[in-house]
Amino acid sequence: MKIKKFSNERFTIYLGDVLDCFSKVHEESVDLVFADPPYNIGKEFAGAKDKFETKEYINWMECWIGEIWRVVKSTGSVYLMNSTQNFAHMDLICQSKFFVQSRIVWAYDSSSVQAKRRFGSSWEPILHMTKSKTGYTFNSENILVEAKTGSQRKLIDYRKIPPRPYNKEKVPSNVWEIPRVRFKMDEYENHPTQKPHALLERVILASSNQGDTVLDPFSGSFSTGYACKELERKFIGFELSEEYVKIGIRRLDLPSSYTRNVLVKKKEKK
């Protein structure tokens, strides 16, 4: 498959297979990677089924994770998602290459499938890792959240002189309670596994700075790219589906030969 490129001075989209697209990215040129690959659980993406033999899927993961290692800077960070079924395989692959900093639980409001003979799943794992043990970007002051003390009264720290109220903000724990994207939300795009803007915003604010380059090798709805646009980062995105690339071109205002009516936002339940 021939790779197609759509770009301006800040954003670049490559339409093609992920491993082919990696050849377009220079070694140690990326500050942050967010990757949300197909989970190998049988979902359909633009007419293609996401289902491979387990061994084949693991070998494929090893290939693109190796490419992430090649392109990310020594000070860079990587966030990888996967299903609860395949996360252990991915975790072991990454431990041989990166320094794992956190294993994050993204907890959302409800399971998409109402299970009858097991407990329904309402979370997805995120692996946060870095190429170096120290010296990586982590802007804790940019992602503070309200500390939930359970108290109705203002808590005072009497160890301080003079005594003062406890700081009401803290760095988030590794359990992120962020709602999933729903059909009626303004941010909804026609993609079956779209990730919330709030989740991507937290990742980008924590592990990159303005002007840094962020890579998403499985761009899908291009929500990572859109968050980079809002937060003044550069963005590189790969996507195999032309249907989803059109979403990216629209969301990032990139020049293309597609007519305006082809790029118009459509809302269809997936």
Residue spans for each PLM region:
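Core catalytic lobe of class I
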Residues: 2-246
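Short, conserved SAM-binding/catalytic segment
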Residues: 2-8, 249-263
